[in-house]
Amino acid sequence: MSNLRGTNRFILVAVLVSFVFLSIMNAEARKEIGYPKQRFGEDRTNPYEEITPPLIGGCDPKNPQTCLPKQPANPYRRGCLKITRCQRDV
């Protein structure tokens, strides 16, 4: 009879420990569930809020003074070759 009581106590403790473990895991998982931030400093608490596209290069059509100067798409230039002796400008 005492062996049965010890087994019941062991099962009760095991179930209690597993419930505590699962509740801790659920608390940690709640931190990750939600809408991720798309940009730095964005608050995504309202998922139906209108999302404006990020300004590319900090350029605003209303304030063209904030636009950065345009750069060539590929500024790479080939170096001097022995055969041309750096005489041509590409």
UniProtKB/Swiss-Prot annotation:
<dbReference type="Pfam" id="PF05498">
    <property type="entry name" value="RALF"/>
</dbReference>
<protein>
    <recommendedName>
        <fullName>Protein RALF-like 3</fullName>
    </recommendedName>
</protein>
<keyword id="KW-1015">Disulfide bond</keyword>
<keyword id="KW-0732">Signal</keyword>
<dbReference type="GO" id="GO:0048046">
    <property type="term" value="C:apoplast"/>
</dbReference>
<dbReference type="GO" id="GO:0005179">
    <property type="term" value="F:hormone activity"/>
</dbReference>
<comment type="similarity">
    <text>Belongs to the plant rapid alkalinization factor (RALF) family.</text>
</comment>
<feature type="disulfide bond">
    <location>
        <begin position="59"/>
        <end position="67"/>
    </location>
</feature>
<keyword id="KW-0964">Secreted</keyword>
<comment type="function">
    <text>Cell signaling peptide that may regulate plant stress, growth, and development. Mediates a rapid alkalinization of extracellular space by mediating a transient increase in the cytoplasmic Ca(2+) concentration leading to a calcium-dependent signaling events through a cell surface receptor and a concomitant activation of some intracellular mitogen-activated protein kinases.</text>
</comment>
<keyword id="KW-0372">Hormone</keyword>
<feature type="disulfide bond">
    <location>
        <begin position="80"/>
        <end position="86"/>
    </location>
</feature>
<dbReference type="InterPro" id="IPR008801">
    <property type="entry name" value="RALF"/>
</dbReference>
<dbReference type="GO" id="GO:0007267">
    <property type="term" value="P:cell-cell signaling"/>
</dbReference>
<dbReference type="GO" id="GO:0040008">
    <property type="term" value="P:regulation of growth"/>
</dbReference>
<dbReference type="GO" id="GO:0019722">
    <property type="term" value="P:calcium-mediated signaling"/>
</dbReference>
<feature type="signal peptide">
    <location>
        <begin position="1"/>
        <end position="29"/>
    </location>
</feature>
